[in-house]
């Protein structure tokens, strides 16, 4: 069944209310690798309840509407979808605990053509329930490889900026734990691809892979450490394109260039010298 453009654009997302505790914030931080140096007081502020602060990229696991594309009524061939890009704008620091409302809408549905797939762009607003303040806005771009050719769609979004040539202005190497995917799945995505060796093998991988949004959090850590002095209020936004999977236990090197007040970056795994995150842009607040 082909995609029905109007049905998808008007998909009835309910508001998602989510309460979370300081333990949840600590678990997310541990999942994306904070605390790997337990003597680093700058990292401890995200993994120890004394003066606890939330990692800014934790917004990606709040107010999640669920895996709705699996609903047969969507017409989407969910088996063939790939998480292509992720963007985050942070309007206010994420509280270390609280209750938020996630409000999701379909921002765009782009028909790339028959046999070329489609782009599905979801926008999610994260609102603090108590104050009504907008905390963050997320864009999740999904490449629907089996769903092109429905004949109606929105204009394609502009391509993200390319990473500069030449030597980066800064690099940051961060390790991932062999059990990182098993920790991160407790925060959000419990897809067995990230835990079950048999499922990973059936999908064509030698072993379970790391969640893309966990790798995203590691890149955010590199930006926060290198350009923000671990001050969450200084990170205004983070966008990137996923280009290859990461295996838990690999080391992620983030290469960064300062351009026009932003940080352009990409990340590669050192063990295989493969770029895994690309076309990254981080906005740094004054």
Predicted feature residues:
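Catalytic-pocket segment enriched in acidic/His residues
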Residues: 198-276, 281
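Generic structural "secondary-structure junction" signal
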Residues: 46-48, 83-84, 90, 96, ...
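A contiguous, surface-exposed recognition patch within enzymatic or periplasmic domains that forms
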Residues: 2-47, 155-215, 222-225
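Short, mixed-charge, low-aromatic patches
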Residues: 1, 58-61, 78, 138-140, ...
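Intrinsically disordered, low-complexity coil segments
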Residues: 39, 129-133, 229-231
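Hydrophobic, proline/glycine-rich low-complexity stretches
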Residues: 1-99
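HotDog/MaoC-like acyl-thioester-processing domains
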Residues: 1-10, 14, 83-172, 246-249, ...
């Amino acid at each position: 069944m082909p995609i029905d453009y109007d049905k998808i654009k008007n998909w009835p997302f309910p508001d998602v209310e989510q309460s979370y505790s300081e333990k949840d914030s600590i678990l997310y931080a541990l999942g994306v690798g904070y605390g790997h140096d337990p003597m680093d007081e700058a990292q401890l502020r995200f993994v120890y309840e004394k003066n606890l602060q939330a990692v800014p990229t934790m917004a990606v696991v709040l107010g999640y509407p669920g895996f709705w594309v699996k609903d047969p009524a969507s017409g989407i061939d969910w088996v063939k979808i790939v998480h292509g890009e992720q963007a985050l704008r942070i309007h206010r620091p994420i509280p270390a605990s609280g209750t938020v409302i996630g409000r999701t809408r379909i921002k765009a549905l782009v028909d790339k053509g028959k046999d070329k797939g489609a782009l599905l762009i979801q926008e999610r607003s994260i609102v603090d329930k108590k104050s009504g303040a907008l905390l963050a806005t997320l864009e999740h771009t999904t490449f629907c490889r089996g769903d092109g050719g429905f004949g109606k769609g929105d204009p394609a979004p502009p391509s993200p900026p390319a990473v500069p040539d030449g030597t980066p202005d800064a690099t940051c190497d961060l390790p991932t734990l062999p059990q990182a995917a098993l920790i991160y799945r407790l925060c959000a995505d419990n897809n067995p691809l990230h835990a079950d060796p048999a499922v990973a093998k059936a999908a064509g991988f030698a072993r379970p892979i790391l969640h893309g949004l966990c790798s995203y959090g590691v890149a955010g850590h590199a930006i926060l450490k290198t350009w923000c002095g671990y001050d969450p209020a200084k990170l205004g936004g983070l966008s990137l394109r996923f280009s290859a999977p990461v295996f838990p236990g690999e080391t992620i090197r983030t290469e960064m260039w300062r351009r026009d007040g932003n940080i352009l970056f990409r990340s590669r795994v050192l063990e295989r010298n493969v770029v895994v995150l690309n076309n990254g842009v981080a906005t740094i607040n004054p």
